[in-house]
Amino acid sequence: MELALYLLPVTLGDTPIETVLPPYNKEIILGIHHFIVEDVRSARRFLKKVDKGIDIDALTFYTLNKHTSPEDISGYLKPLVEGHPMGVISEAGCPAVADPGADVVAIAQRKNLRVVPLVGPSSIILSVMGSGFNGQSFAFHGYLPIEPAERAKKLKMLEQRVYNEHQTQLFIETPYRNNKMIEDILHNCRPQTKLCIAANITCEGEYIKTKTVREWQGKTPDLSKILCIFLLYK
């Protein structure tokens, strides 16, 4: 296999590997012994899911999350510089997209090291695909403010971008606060604004539905403790 930093997508939940990841990914994974991961425990679990016979103890893991210092991140690429292929694994979905993995990819690019993204599920892309919204211009904002007044202000700002820039707006919430997020959207956005709720993407019980804010009133699903993305458009 080629010497490179491989970006290795992960399933979005308990989805069987074969339904969302091509066999080529497994071939690449089995040839790597150095992994940069967001969470070691979930990475080990994913690798065992890819191949039960994989020798986890023979692998080296480097933790990359929001607490990792820039100095540590730069040092993580030493095996790659020395001639060993490396892999980047997020907790879910595609690494380096709304994910700390982007930091190590940026360093690899600066060092002129080969970077190879592999095919796999992205909740951001899949939710845009399933929403019926503008897929040529969209923005993902991560988590919105928790404080009510700030959240209301942010929602109105995102909604304004929908109408001014014709741009799809995406954001997420901690699962146990999903229902409150829906309440806030319905309270602060215009009746004609469209809201897509995309939950459990690629998993059992997948739910992707688009309606206007007016149509959602009094008819929202219970999304507590479910991974979900919210999308706004017109």
Question: Where are the regions that the model predicts?
Answer:
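Short active-site oxyanion
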Residues: 29-35, 112-116, 168-169
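Class I SAM-dependent methyltransferase SAM-binding "motif I" and its flanking Rossmann-like core
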Residues: 6, 103-161
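Conserved helicase motor
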Residues: 62-69, 144-148
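A contiguous loop/helix-start segment that scaffolds small-molecule binding in enzyme catalytic cores
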Residues: 2-6, 84-85, 163-234
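Glycine-rich, flexible N-terminal cofactor/catalytic loop recognition
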Residues: 1-64
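Short glycine-rich anion-binding loops that position phosphate/pyrophosphate groups of nucleotides
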Residues: 12-14, 91-95, 175-176
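Glycine/small-residue-rich loop that forms an oxyanion/phosphate-binding "nest" at active or ligand-binding sites
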Residues: 65, 73-115
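Acidic beta-strand-to-loop metal/phosphate-binding motif
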Residues: 36-37, 87-93, 168-173
